[in-house]
């Protein structure tokens, strides 16, 4: 479970940059998939090949029939599914960290530029306005959440889309390989079996229950992804149409003095003493 805990810790870091649906999806992934895979499901399939027997003594027949019945173990397929559906979220987290790092660099650069501009008198405002092209679009806070903007929004939507695609793809793979139920007897006619033989699976009913449970969890995750995708699209369109004129651009440094007048072009503030005061880094989420 230590490896799964590391994955869970990474996914937990995405929560501040996710919607409520994304947070629920992470809980569903960890509680109903990772915990079960690491405990009950793994133990249920521990005797999968050892207890697979066929009514023949022909050497190699059981191995060939087992390979035909289960090209890949259910547990290993579900592990791959967890990894694949987690990758888009982790890539979104990497993009978030990249943007944060770039903003930190921009903040340091502008702090140095503003210090120089402060001592250059009237040229300070002109120097400051040179950086308007570097300003990032900010989001305002609403109900404790953060509004996604620009490329981060596109990355988040892409991560939801690919998670949905992977969910459907793995469901189709599972259905194509061995369906969603297991029978107690598997009929095999593969060579080197001398004739048609019957092979017997261990605990087929228990495994079928787990298979159906994982199927339900996959479908719930898919529905959550679809709902979240439409929600994010709706909010993005609504914010674009309703708040287009109210969007602000700001410098990634902290506003310190209150007795200042804001510029109409950017959230850059010029004080009465001609001192340039940096403006705070607003988040790119709401």
Curated annotation (Swiss-Prot):
Expressed in which tissues: Expressed in testis.
Gene Ontology BP, a term: heart development
Keyword line: Cell junction, Cell membrane, Gap junction, Membrane, Transmembrane, Transmembrane helix
One GO term describing the cellular component: connexin complex
Molecular functions per Gene Ontology: gap junction channel activity
Domain of life the protein comes from: Eukaryota
Cytoplasmic topological domain residue ranges: 1-23, 100-151, 233-286
Subunit structure: A connexon is composed of a hexamer of connexins.
Role according to the record: One gap junction consists of a cluster of closely packed pairs of transmembrane channels, the connexons, through which materials of low MW diffuse from one cell to a neighboring cell.
UniProt similarity note: Belongs to the connexin family. Alpha-type (group II) subfamily.
Protein name (database record): Gap junction alpha-6 protein
Gene encoding the protein: Gja6
């Amino acid at each position: 479970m230590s490896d799964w805990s590391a994955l869970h810790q990474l996914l937990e870091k995405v929560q501040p940059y996710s919607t409520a649906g994304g947070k629920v999806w992470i809980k569903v992934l960890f509680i109903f998939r990772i915990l079960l895979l690491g405990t009950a499901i793994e133990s249920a399939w521990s005797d999968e090949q050892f207890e697979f027997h066929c009514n023949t003594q022909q050497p190699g027949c059981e191995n060939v029939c087992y390979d035909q019945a289960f090209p890949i173990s259910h547990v290993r397929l579900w592990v791959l599914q967890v990894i694949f559906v987690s990758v888009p979220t982790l890539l979104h987290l990497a993009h978030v960290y990249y943007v944060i790092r770039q903003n930190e660099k921009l903040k340091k650069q502008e702090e140095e530029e503003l210090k120089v501009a402060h001592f250059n008198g009237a040229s300070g405002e002109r120097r400051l306005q040179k950086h308007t092209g570097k300003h990032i679009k900010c989001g305002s806070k609403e109900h404790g959440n953060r509004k996604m903007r620009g490329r981060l929004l596109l990355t988040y939507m892409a991560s939801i889309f690919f998670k949905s695609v992977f969910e459907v793809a793995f469901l189709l793979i599972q259905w194509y390989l061995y369906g969603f139920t297991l029978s107690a007897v598997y009929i095999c006619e593969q060579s080197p079996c001398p004739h048609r033989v019957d092979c017997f699976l261990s605990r087929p009913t228990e495994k079928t229950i787990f298979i159906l449970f994982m199927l339900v969890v996959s479908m719930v995750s898919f529905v959550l992804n679809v709902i979240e995708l439409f929600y994010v699209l709706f909010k993005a369109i609504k914010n674009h149409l309703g708040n287009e004129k109210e969007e602000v651009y700001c410098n990634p440094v902290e506003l310190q003095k209150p007795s200042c007048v804001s510029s109409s072009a950017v959230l850059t503030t010029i004080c009465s003493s001609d001192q340039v005061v940096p403006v705070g880094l607003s988040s790119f989420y709401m």
